[in-house]
């Protein structure tokens, strides 16, 4: 890897800024000052320091975000704030969200630059489960639980795969947990519409074995732990 690319990956500076940084003699490779941005380094073996602090290279990073309402699950948008905008600390890593969460929904979003893992997690063949907490306009009963279990026919004729509905409270505004392994557009909202009910609040709380860290306020984020990363990769 070129030294200027390494410095960018470690969030020291942009590649265009690297010449100025190197000119100041602030970067050392294996103890020697280097001022040539184009030299090749081995990011796994060479010791590179900036201001005498060792730079640690990580090819992939994995971020848990508690998405607020009004933010879109995209890498860029001309009108709305995106989930990537909320994690600008890692802008140099070119993160993208693993799947979608509707603009008006809140909760768990995982972002990474690991395209291979994203492909695995989003593959319909993998049946990766996602759990949501919902508030529903209308009373829920056992017939709704059975409908989720057997699959629900949406307005376009699509029959959803088996899911799970756990009723917390049944009232004019009911509360429940819903588990599905698909990600069709507005899927849960459309499933409840098919049951003559309306979703008034939706929060994703779990993807596979990764649970939303409840210490994160909306808009806050943290890196996944090694245990969480390994759990994601164990598909």
Place the predicted regions along the sequence by residue.
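Basic, flexible Lys/Arg- and Gly-enriched helix-loop patches that mediate nucleic-acid binding at interfaces
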Residues: 1-235
């Amino acid at each position: 890897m070129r030294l200027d690319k390494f410095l960018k990956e470690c969030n020291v500076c942009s590649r265009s800024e690297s010449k100025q940084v190197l000119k100041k003699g602030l970067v050392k490779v294996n103890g020697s000052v280097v001022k040539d941005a184009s030299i090749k380094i081995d990011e796994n073996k060479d010791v590179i320091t900036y201001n005498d602090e060792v730079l640690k290279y990580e090819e992939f990073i994995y971020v848990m975000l508690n998405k607020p309402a009004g933010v879109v699950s995209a890498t860029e948008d001309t009108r709305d704030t995106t989930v990537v905008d909320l994690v600008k600390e890692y802008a140099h890593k070119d993160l993208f969200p693993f799947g979608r969460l509707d603009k008006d929904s809140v909760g768990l979003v995982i972002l990474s630059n690991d395209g291979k893992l994203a492909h695995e997690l989003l593959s319909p063949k993998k049946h990766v489960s996602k759990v949501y907490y919902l508030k529903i306009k209308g009373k829920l009963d056992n017939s709704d639980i059975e409908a989720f279990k057997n699959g629900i026919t949406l307005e376009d004729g699509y029959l959803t795969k088996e899911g799970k509905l756990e009723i917390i409270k049944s009232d004019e505004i009911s509360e429940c947990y819903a588990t599905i392994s698909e990600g069709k557009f507005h899927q849960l909202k459309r499933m409840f519409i098919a049951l003559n009910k309306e979703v008034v609040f939706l929060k994703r709380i779990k993807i596979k074995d990764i649970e939303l860290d409840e210490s994160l306020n909306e808009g806050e984020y943290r890196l996944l732990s090694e245990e969480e990363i390994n759990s994601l990769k164990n598909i």
